[in-house]
Design a protein with these regions (language model features):
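Conserved core of the PLP fold type I
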Residues: 57-143
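N-terminal "arm"/small-domain region of PLP-dependent enzymes with the aminotransferase-like
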Residues: 1-69, 73
Length: 143
């Protein structure tokens, strides 16, 4: 697709640093210490099987459907209870479940960052956070 058909905000986008790291993590002989790719041998296969079987036997009708965008009400209620146990007052409606760090950072950036704002990040930092904050047109200050 030619760049002039893209929105101005998309015309200068570059490949993500994470995408570049993932390419290297797949190379023979490379032991990845990043990229969010844990060793599958470390997964709790039996525990995952038990959990999967429980979901499929108890909630089959819902397991393969789209859910509420803010998350499953029972999970949000449980998180509210955990927060209250730690002295944090909130309602289940205050809790939003996301599909991982990228979505969480994107939601936060859209809600809290205006173009030109400065975001303080630690050094070293999570590369994907820089990508999200960059799309929000933020400046970075590392500490």
């Amino acid at each position: 697709m030619s760049a002039n058909k893209l929105a101005r905000s998309a015309q200068g986008l570059q490949s993500s640093a994470i995408r570049e790291l993932l390419k290297h993590s797949k190379m023979a002989g490379v032991i990845s210490l990043g990229g969010g790719i844990p060793n599958p041998d470390l997964f709790d296969r039996e525990g995952l099987k038990i959990a999967s079987d429980a979901v499929l036997s108890q909630h089959f009708g819902e397991a393969f459907q789209y859910g509420l965008t803010e998350g499953v009400p029972g999970l949000r209620e449980e998180i509210k209870r955990i927060c209250e146990g730690r002295g944090i007052t909130c309602k289940a409606d205050d809790v939003v479940i996301t599909s991982g760090s990228q979505q969480s950072l994107d939601v936060l950036a859209r809600a809290l960052i205006n173009p030109g704002d400065t975001v303080v990040v630690e050094r070293p930092t999570y590369l994907a956070a820089l990508q999200v904050f960059g799309l929000a047109q933020a400046n970075f200050e590392s500490v």
